[in-house]
Amino acid sequence: MGNPVIVEAVRTPIGRRGGWLAGLKPQALLGHAQRSVVMRAGIDPSTVGQVFAGCVTQSGEQGGHVGRYAWLYAGLPAQTGATTIDCQCGSSQQAVHLAAAIVHAGVATAAIGCGVEAMSRCPLGSNVLPATPRPADWSIDIPDQFAAAERIADRRGLGREQLDEFGLRSQQLAAQAWADGRFDREIVPVQAPVPGDDAVAGTRTALVSRDQGLRDTSRGALAALKPVRGEGARHTAGTASQVSDGAAAVLVMDEQAARASGLRPRARILAQALVGAEPYYHLDGPVQATAKVLAGAGMTVGDIDLFEVNEAFASVVLSWACVHKPDMAKVNVNGGAIALGHPVGATGARLITSALHELERSGSATALITMCAGGALSTATILERI
């Protein structure tokens, strides 16, 4: 049995819809992350046993096994196997879990968990457009994302002002993190076509090395935004995650094999979880996933130094906080998807990457990463810095 550890983790910058990364095909985005994590670790890519890639909208340019074709696009060894998975927004976090599982099982001594979403080119939901009809006997009350976010706000008694305050917090923390250089180590800059008038074509290229989604906002500006779902709703564009392009990759190895190769293990995966949540609330799964992953590690909220709770909507994080009552100074310390963006198939691996680098920067010991996912699912991971 292997002892899985994280040896390296990288991510691309995150681009806005139609923005800096819109001219890159998903194979190029993900292939860049895959190749970068291998090259930065300094391992022979032929020693990677398997690749697990998360992607949500698996159609169009993201159809036909994007994880495998990204690997080949990057010029990496053809003999390495790959699996592309759909666990909705939890896809690449679950990809890292699967990479760790096969290392633990002794199937491989090295594996990559990664993910991509090129939402400018493959819009969310385009794989079921025009709307795929539900069965005539469908009786499950599972709302869309915005309706779910509003239901969660109702459930916890969260008001518009609280949500706006959290949206402002995300922007301010992310801006400060960039100013302090906190993301520099995890980012792998990418050469991308400069978008043309059609937003996905260009003849010039530019090196993209920074997240595009940050906004200089204020309480007044957020308060002036109209709710997405009309009068009476609470969530606005300022308290929801952004439509984005990006990729991330995490290299998992057996600890003994890594040390024998002269590589430095950087974190252990103490526990992982994938849970189903109550469909009526759809996106409230991080509450249950956190409880399960803590139980699996034999830990409590007080044992965790850093939390990364994906900011799909402000109410998702605040609902989670209402139940688990963490020290909020430990939660999303460098901002989250409201400010940085949410390339859905890549975000899980991005959160693990950011958590690893922040553990090292701050000298902290443990991190818990969790996120909601479509289909009333949620993933969670606990890392321990080595």
Describe the role of every protein-language-model region.
Residues M1-L24, R219-D284, Q288, A295, ...:
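Condensing-enzyme catalytic core mediating Claisen C-C bond formation in acyl metabolism
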Residues R11-T12, G23, G31-H32, E165-A260, ...:
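N-terminal extracellular/periplasmic Venus flytrap/periplasmic-binding protein-like
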Residues A22-A110, V116-T132, I187-V208, Y280, ...:
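Conserved beta-ketoacyl condensing-enzyme motif
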Residues L24, C55-T109, I140-A147, D216-Q242, ...:
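Conserved catalytic cysteine-centered active-site region
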Residues P26-G42, V66-A70, A95, Q145-I152, ...:
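Short, well-ordered amphipathic alpha-helical segments that serve as non-catalytic structural scaffolds
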Residues G49, E150, E186, L270-A339:
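Active-site pocket-lining segment
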Residues I85-V116, A153-F183, A249-Q256, P343-S364, ...:
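Active-site-proximal alpha-helical scaffold in enzymes
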